[in-house]
Amino acid sequence: MTSAAQLTALLHLASPALPVGAFSYSQGLEAAVEARHVHDEASAARWIAEGLAVLAACEAPLWLLQYADWQAGRLDAVAERDGWFLATRETRELRLETAQMGWSLARLIAQMGWGAPAMRDALAARAAITFPTAFAAAAVALGIEARDGLTAYSFAWVENQVAAAVKAIPLGQAAGQRILFGLHAAVGQAAEDAARRAACHPPELSTFSPGLGVLSARHETQYSRLFRS
């Protein structure tokens, strides 16, 4: 059972107040709005649900693998998989997004003194570190269970997408909350799917999301925009 201290740490990591700049990214959603693929509450809910399925196929199982390697002190494996994940980001803005957020969280870990010195040294030694790798490190450092940490990571992603949809479409606050509430079960299912993929030998990671890649590439030169991705 999650203790009060673990729950508090979990809420801290999943908080929109975490200074990693997540609010400035839409991960292709703004380009989808520009292209009219997303234009109302229903289409926004569908877009975010599909994005969560993409996350469950690669980023979420990778998060679990990174968590296990951080916990076991397998720093070479952490570095190798982190480099692989960065290389799978299909556009410059998506690479910059995960690298900036990862750097910001790694810096916070160092400033807060979270985790063992070896972990902090490994984070500091990376020229670029992705966000799932840094978040998994923080979860290990704070004693958060793997499944709880991944659920928080996934929910924070959904929450940020909802906030982006509210701003970009725009939608009312109640519509945003309906989308968020409607995806509660999907967040849990994503964690289950990720655990199954991470347990495969070799891990079953799929980066297939051509629509996101195309929209992100278009967003890089979009004339007017609110978000950095």
From Swiss-Prot:
Record bears the keyword Chaperone: yes
Gene Ontology CC terms: cytoplasm
UniProt keyword terms in alphabetical order: Chaperone, Cytoplasm, Nickel insertion
Major place of residence: cytoplasm
Presence of keyword Cell inner membrane: no
InterPro entries per record: UreF, UreF_sf
Compartments, record wording: Cytoplasm
Cleaved signal peptide residues: none
Family label: Belongs to the UreF family.
Name of protein: Urease accessory protein UreF
Organism: Ralstonia nicotianae (strain ATCC BAA-1114 / GMI1000) (Ralstonia solanacearum)
Gene: ureF
